[in-house]
Amino acid sequence: MNNTDTLEKIIRHQKNKDPAYPFQEHLLMQLCIRANKRMQDNISEFLGAYGINHSVYMVLTTLFTAESHCLSPSEISQKLQFTRTNITRITDFLEKTGYVKRTDSREDRRAKKISLTSEGMFFIQRLTLAQSMYLKEIWGYLTHDEQELFEVINKKLLAHLDDVSS
C-alpha cells in the first residue's frame, strides 16, 4: 500500500463515520500539501547540489534579470519581500563565492549597489540550463493538456483562496 492509498483509507474511514464528510475535498487538500512538500524538497535538493538555497537563487535571478545586473540591497529586498537583514546575509555569502560584488552607488556615496560578477553570470546561466532540464523531467510526466489544465486549476484555486482569506 503506497502513501496515497493509506491517506485515502484514513479519510475514507472519516467518511464512513459521517456520510456528509467532504472526502474528495479532504483528499485533494492532502494531495496538494504532499505534492507541494515533495516539490519543495526536490527543489531544495537540486539547488543544494549547487551549494545554494532557494533564497540565494532568488537573489541571483533577480540580479540576473535586472538592468546592468545591478541593484541596491533595498531594491532586492523590496522585489523579493525579504528583510534587509536577510539580503545582507545572502549578499555576504554570494560575495564570498565571488558571484556578486558590492560597489558604491553613483547617485549616493553612502549607498551600496550589488552587482553580479562574470562568475555569477556564468553560474546562473549554468544553473538555469540545468534547471530547464530538471523542470522538463518533472513536468514531462504530464501531457501538455494535463499541464495546461493543472495551471488553470491552480490559478483558479489560488484566486479563490485569496478571496476566502480576505
UniProtKB/Swiss-Prot annotation:
InterPro entries in alphabetical order: HTH_MarR-typ (IPR000835), Tscrpt_reg_MarR-type_CS (IPR023187), WH-like_DNA-bd_sf (IPR036388), WH_DNA-bd_sf (IPR036390)
Record keywords, A-Z: Cytoplasm, DNA-binding, Transcription, Transcription regulation
Subcellular location field: Cytoplasm
UniProt keyword Transcription regulation, yes or no: yes
Name this protein carries in UniProt: HTH-type transcriptional regulator PrsX
GO molecular function terms listed in the Swiss-Prot or TrEMBL record: DNA binding; DNA-binding transcription factor activity
SMART domains: HTH_MARR
Lineage, opening ranks: Bacteria, Pseudomonadati, Pseudomonadota, Gammaproteobacteria, Enterobacterales
PROSITE patterns: HTH_MARR_1, HTH_MARR_2
Pfam families with a match to the protein in the record: MarR
Every HTH marR-type domain range: 25-159
Main location: cytoplasm
GO cellular component terms attached to this protein's record: cytoplasm
